UniProtKB/Swiss-Prot annotation:
Keywords: Autocatalytic cleavage, Cytoplasm, Hydrolase, Protease, Proteasome, Threonine protease, Zymogen. One of its GO terms (cellular component) is proteasome core complex, beta-subunit complex. It comes from the Archaea. This is Proteasome subunit beta 2. It comes from Hyperthermus butylicus (strain DSM 5456 / JCM 9403 / PLM1-5).
Length: 212
């Protein structure tokens, strides 16, 4: 959100829907593909889930350039950490790294809302806002379609869902926003991260709209 000059009101800068959900043995991230500039559909196949490592990924909402730069910095930092320390960086440490960058730029902020999900000793999910605030979550949704998506997740969430059921829940949550939110659309991408795997799924709009 940004201050709208001359009105004293807040307005949404960008539109999207991203979700993150933690299950017993894995974490699921999902996002739509539509990129907008105001009410104009700027791109129909935008990748909003960025792979950081084989055990970590980040969803993005906000300004594309800011999100891409932060993802590149994080990927480079985690790679350097692994070379120096001969072990993986924890998801919490990666979230704190992003938090430091965002907080240090709070007077000239990066316009982003990030979800960082991955697996270290267990599946983890962090919600990071543009001022650097970090919260660990079991499930969360961001973007203009988040009010619709979070309702679907809260209604059907269980930590013990199978992977197939978990992917279906994430897809259904974003699909609900596609139906209701002008700024969300054009398909859904889903990533599942577990102890020894990183899996990607893509769903086309025509198939998503069949989802109840």
């Amino acid at each position: 959100m940004l201050h709208h000059p001359g009105t004293g009101q807040l307005r949404a800068l960008k539109g999207t829907t991203t979700v993150g959900i933690v299950f017993r043995d894995f974490v699921v991230l999902a996002a739509d593909r539509r990129a907008t500039a105001g009410y104009f559909v700027a791109h129909k196949r935008t990748k909003k889930i960025i792979k950081i490592t084989d055990y970590m990924a980040m969803t993005t909402a906000g300004l594309v350039a800011d999100a891409q730069m932060l993802a590149e910095w994080l990927a480079n930092h985690t790679h350097y950490y692994e070379i120096v320390n001969k072990r993986r960086m924890s998801i919490h440490a990666a979230a704190q790294y992003l938090s430091i960058i965002l907080h240090s730029a709070k007077f000239y902020p990066y316009i982003v809302q990030l979800l960082l999900g991955g697996y270290d000793t267990q599946p983890r999910l962090y919600n990071i806002d543009w001022f650097g605030s970090v919260t660990e979550e079991k499930y969360v949704a961001t973007g203009s379609g988040s009010p619709t998506a979070i309702g679907v997740i809260e209604d059907q969430y269980s930590p013990n869902l199978s992977m197939e059921e978990a992917v279906e829940l994430a897809k259904r949550a974003v699909a609900s926003s596609i139906r209701r939110d002008t700024f969300t659309g054009n398909g859904v991408d889903v990533v599942v991260i577990g102890k020894d795997f990183y899996r990607e799924y893509s769903f086309e709009l025509k198939d998503i709209l069949k989802t109840k």
